[in-house]
Amino acid sequence: MTEQSAHEKYEFKKKLESLRDKKGRSTELISLYIPADKQIFDVTNQLKDEHGQAANIKSKLTRTNVQGAIESLLSRLRYLDKVPENGIVYFTGAVDIGANKTSMESEVIIPPEPITVYKYHCDSSFYLEPLEDMLKDKSTFGLLVLDRREATIGLLVGKRIQAFRNLTSTVPGKQRKGGQSAHRFQQLRLIAIHDFYKRIGDAASEIFMAVDHKDLKGVLIGGPSPTKEEFYGGEFLHHELQKKILGLFDTAYTDESGLSELVNAAGEKLQDLELMGQKNAVRDFFKELIADSGKVAYGETQVRANLEINAVDVLLLSEDLRAERVTTKCSVCGYENKWTRRWKPGEPAPTAGNCPKCGSSLEVTDVIDVVDEFSELADKSNAKVVFVSTDFDEGSQLMNAFGGIAAILRYSTGV
């Protein structure tokens, strides 16, 4: 499975927003999740059964709409030779469009990650949770909490903590038994501590090195002082993992609950890492802006003009940007106009209005997503595209003060 680009993630998120907003009457919207290992023949048989059961629905309108949606699915499945590697999801049903009217709508999604469970769902809204989960961060971090008595090793995958192994030591307490000199006892104790640290390092290295190198973003170590500092200083982890240690954090527990404590303690660090690339790009933009170097552009008009002359080095687009470039035309006098519409999920499609020249009705001839347009222009000129979250101050400022569109230029253009 190939990793989604930032633009693909944006498009996927936008599509789910659109589906989330659609509502049906009663249970007229069908969601069908088909994993790769599911036989199409079996799915078809179940849909035929559901079609038969729908005949018992008392409301004639609901019965007609549900059976119509199932018939639409059966028709689509006839042309599906093989389920894609990641599975396939169908959404279909009579969507309420207001004024006591409905519209039969369908959407097909090839998910970015494999579907693991087959599901047929009939409700007044589409079932989106499995796909929305795919939008969540899947970055992986190695977790290790330890003291001289115990250690627990785990992974943080996205927001989910997985405990893999718990180790206990044979390190004796600080009080020596009778018959041993204090010096000899201390030597044996240090050897036992070293051996335990080595055992922890070997076990943690085995677990962390099994994660794909590009997916493992770093290693977090927790525990009381001075244990975690001793372990870190002794370089007991594989040398590649040693380079990925992001920090040492105080935790009171070293069992499985200590892993949760470690993640909470490192929360700010993890968020900074997740947003670091975005933060750096936005800060570079503000640096150039404050320096008045002329190597920045912001706002739709300025940035579009610089993209068209291949002057953009880094294009910054807010993840919350929702804008369409609408073209309207008059078929009578030939008047044409292009304008940008900012929108929110659930808002109706743009209306054309009347021609300012002759008064005739205008026609919407083209609608293009501004993000799609700008991403395509950036791709043609090899400009880097950075999608920026509003979860940090500068990202929020990019959206609110600059309309969610800005650029760092290769040279000053005066445009």
Curated annotation (Swiss-Prot):
Organism placement in taxonomy: Archaea, Methanobacteriati, Methanobacteriota, Stenosarchaea group, Methanomicrobia
GO terms of molecular function: sequence-specific mRNA binding; translation release factor activity, codon specific
Assembly and binders: Heterodimer of two subunits, one of which binds GTP.
Gene3D superfamilies cross-referenced by the UniProt entry: 1.20.5.170, 3.30.1330.30, eRF1 domain 1, eRF1 domain 2
Keyword Protein biosynthesis: yes
Membrane-crossing residue ranges in chain numbering: none
Family affiliation: Belongs to the eukaryotic release factor 1 family.
Keywords, alphabetical: Cytoplasm, Protein biosynthesis
GO cellular component term, pick one: cytosol
Organism: Methanosarcina acetivorans (strain ATCC 35395 / DSM 2834 / JCM 12185 / C2A)
Disulfide cross-links: none
Compartments where located: Cytoplasm
Main location: cytoplasm
Role description: Directs the termination of nascent peptide synthesis (translation) in response to the termination codons UAA, UAG and UGA.
InterPro entries documented for this protein: eFR1_2_sf, eRF1_1_Pelota, eRF1_1_sf, eRF1_2, eRF1_3, Peptide_chain-rel_aRF1, Peptide_chain-rel_eRF1/aRF1, Ribosomal_eL30-like_sf
Gene this chain is encoded by: prf11
HAMAP family reported for this sequence: Rel_fact_arch_1
Keyword Ribonucleoprotein: no
Protein name: Peptide chain release factor subunit 1-1
Name of one Pfam family that matches: eRF1_1
